[in-house]
Structure formats: C-alpha cells, structure tokens
C-alpha cells in the first residue's frame, strides 16, 4: 500500500497568538484571519512486508529505523520527534516507511510544522483504517505538537492546513469555528509579497513568553491583545468587502502593536527588508508567525507588487517566494 498526503501552509494576517489557549477566553470576539498558500507539506507512506518502521525527513536530512516491537520507544525518541510521537499515537500494526518533505523554508513562520503535522495525521489515519474522524485531526495535532514543543500551541495553523482557503477562525467558550471568507482571491494575490529573510526562528519560545505575561496579569499585554482582537474583526470585514485600501490601513496599524507586544519580533535583517519594501511600493509589513526570523508578508500598493519583489530580491539572503492562494486543504490518497 502507498499513501500520499499533502496540506498547505499559511500566511497569518491578523490575530496571531490570541489563538493560544487560554488567551482567547479573555478577549470576547477573539478571532484570527489567515489564508492558505500552495507551499505544501507532503507525506508518503509505503507499507513493508516486514516489521520495520523507517522515518525520514528529506528537508532535515534525517532518517532512522526501528521496528514494531519497539514502537513504545518512539514516545521518547528525540530524532524526528513530531513524526515519532505521531507514529506512537496511531500505533500501526504493519511495517512501513514514512517520508516527509516541505516546500516552505525551515523556520519560515508559515506554520510548516503544524502543516506537516496535519499531513502526517491524514496519512497515518489512512494507514490504520481511518480510525479517527477528520474533525478530530486538529485537537490531535495540537495536543501532540504541545508534547513536542512543551508549551501551549495555537490553533489557527491547523485549520488552514486541513481546510485551505481564506478564513476567520472564531474562538469562543463553546469551541472554535471556521468561517470561510469569500474574497477576491486574484486581488489578494496581486497585493501580497512573501519574502523569506534567510533567518529561521523558533515560534514556541517567543509565544510562551508572551503567554506567561498575559496570564500573570500584565495590563499592557492585555490591552495589546484587545487591539489584536479588534484588528482581526476589522480585517475580516474589510476582506469580505474587498476593500483593499482599508485592508492596507488595518495591516499598517497592526504592525507597531505587534512590535510593542514582542520587540524581538524583527531582527536587524528584517528591519532592513521592511524599510526597503516600504520605500518601493509596500503599504504594510506583516511578520509571519511569531517572528524573530522567518518570512514577512508585504501588502503592496496597486500594481506595485513587482517593484517590491525586485527591491527585496536585491538584498542579501532574502528570497522572494513564489506562491498562490490554495483553496484546497488536506488531501489523502491511496495509490
């Protein structure tokens, strides 16, 4: 049996960090807004006639082998820890090789690990006979990723990976709901530049420091999160109205708020790229994910996307990513 799965990464436009439990419970109307992009995470599982389990990450150039009788040891396996814990959870009863690969740069802030998580869950669930319903994939992914990074994890990234498209994720005491946003996709694509800075980052540590401040009752942090909540609400409305002028203004106003929340969200290299883009046709910069490296999404003036891309491409270590909005989420097929 051969199983292949894929899932899209995402660009988060508004609401980042407020999706980490329990923070959203403290801000009525908490939501995030993001869109999926076709920089995919891919998984291939091929069953074997023996009891060997082979796990391989092409991106990390790591590959190791174990066996079904040692499956319990995968819970504490440090190599390819996410994959190991997922295999331990699903407990397959046949030997197999699982190979993973991501099209997004490592540490890009595009939810690469969360996306790979969903793609692995889809493939492994198929391997064990569709043991779990698709609506359980997101809580499984969040809980296992929390075991790996050892701090609470946000939820928005799993929704874009599983469902694709442009969406607002609403967080309420009775649960989370995904609202698909019907927007002018072509106009969004013509306005957004995604640039990888050449510097990977670790989102878990950055977000945990912010989470602790919030729970400890820091008034300034609480006020910033209220503003983050408001930005998500306003951006959702602007996107639904296809109001690109207002969209740019909302993103522009959100940037200093995010910097106040976490001054280390940008590095000197990122500051340089932001300044370069803003003088060549960008209206606003949105650091992807938790920042401190990774990617920046730039919202551009009408017909200025090419100018921004050209200016960024001239900077050392910067890589302008080629992308399209991805309407389709997780796909799993048996060959």
PLM regions: where:
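Short secondary-structure capping/junction motifs at helix and strand boundaries
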Residues: 93-99, 130-137
